[in-house]
From Swiss-Prot:
Subunit text: F-type ATPases have 2 components, F(1) - the catalytic core - and F(0) - the membrane proton channel. F(1) has five subunits: alpha(3), beta(3), gamma(1), delta(1), epsilon(1). F(0) has four main subunits: a(1), b(1), b'(1) and c(10-14). The alpha and beta chains form an alternating ring which encloses part of the gamma chain. F(1) is attached to F(0) by a central stalk formed by the gamma and epsilon chains, while a peripheral stalk is formed by the delta, b and b' chains.
Gene designation: atpF2
Entry GO terms, CC: chloroplast thylakoid membrane; proton-transporting ATP synthase complex
Pfam families listed in its UniProt record: ATP-synt_B
Taxonomy of the source species: Eukaryota, Rhodophyta, Bangiophyceae, Cyanidiales, Cyanidiaceae
Claim: Thylakoid is one of the keywords in the record: yes
Primary subcellular site in the record, as a coarse category: plastid
Native species: Cyanidioschyzon merolae (strain NIES-3377 / 10D)
SUPFAM superfamilies in UniProt: Apolipoprotein A-I (SSF58113)
UniProt-recorded name of the protein: ATP synthase subunit b', chloroplastic
Amino acid sequence: MSTGLFDFNGTLPVMGLQVVLLSWLLEQILYSPIQGVIQKRQNKIQQELQLAADQLQKAQQLTQEYQTQLQKAREKARERIRQVQQEAQTMMEDQLKQAQQQMTQLFNEAMQQLEQQKQQALMNLSNQVDEVAKFILSKLMKQ
């Protein structure tokens, strides 16, 4: 009988067997199910990460498409504004030309009327001068 740390009697193999049996039982009852749950959780996390990455890629693609469409819409709006401004400028120039033509026409008509009135006044004046001259001449002749 030895009182050392390790006694090689029947208890040592039984304890070894108990450790092996307990390890096997823990593996079957506790570790394997926990590893299964952990593996399922990791798989679920991986799937969710993949889904999130796919959705992020889709969102980025949609964002790019919307930005492209927005840029095209802005370009169309700028072009339309330019066209409207050009049309307004052309319309304004046309109206200005038309107004100038009307003013020129009115001026010419007024000048013609003034010329006619001048000619009429000169004729009346000439007639009156002739009448006065005839009157004076007739008075002078009577004397």
